[in-house]
């Protein structure tokens, strides 16, 4: 946990590799990356509040809160990946502007997705956040493919490299660790909660229908 916390509040590794260590710039990078998961964390607390005040079907807001955490994590790794690409292609100022613009887009995407899928009914928060997390997982896979040449050539930015260094490929190990595993863990616990609900209240879904 301490390692992940240090990752959030420390200078991003791409900036360190490029020798960017100005305090104000580092503060902007840290702030923009932290803002990436604020919307999902807000919905996490909202789901936990719904679980606290609910008389039954507490598993729905609880599992929804779990998926919001998955979305928050994916939002962070997406912002970190865009930071890597933009630092290579743009100067510091445009990169910071793009990062904050990305947070605005992320906030709008999450808000509109939840509103469109749930139509104001909190009972649909779980499928909404599952859909959001799956979309973000697909976006991370595309981003990993796009930034794959940058990752290989980053330490040798000023040197000439062979054309093979600029070929796009997918790092399946990285995708599995950073995208598939979080979604898989959340899916497992969602399935367990659903089975528990069916076992304890076998007629609950018939009644709710």
Curated annotation (Swiss-Prot):
Subcellular location: Endoplasmic reticulum membrane
Signal peptide: none
UniProt organism field: Schizosaccharomyces pombe (strain 972 / ATCC 24843)
Record-given protein name: N-glycosylation protein eos1
Metal-binding as UniProt keyword: no
PANTHER family: N-GLYCOSYLATION PROTEIN EOS1
Family of the protein in this entry: Belongs to the EOS1 family.
Keyword Transmembrane helix: yes
Lumenal topological domain: 1-22, 85-98, 143-174
Topological category with respect to the lipid bilayer: Multi-pass membrane protein
GO cellular component: endoplasmic reticulum membrane
An annotated GO BP: protein N-linked glycosylation
Stretches that traverse the bilayer: 23-45, 64-84, 99-119, 122-142, 175-195
Stretches of the chain found on the membrane's Cytoplasmic side: 46-63, 120-121, 196-209
Job of this protein: Involved in N-glycosylation.
Lineage: Eukaryota, Fungi, Dikarya, Ascomycota, Taphrinomycotina
InterPro entries, alphabetized: N-glycosylation_EOS1
Coiled-coil stretches noted in the UniProt entry, renumbered to this chain: none
Keywords recorded for this protein, A-Z: Endoplasmic reticulum, Membrane, Transmembrane, Transmembrane helix
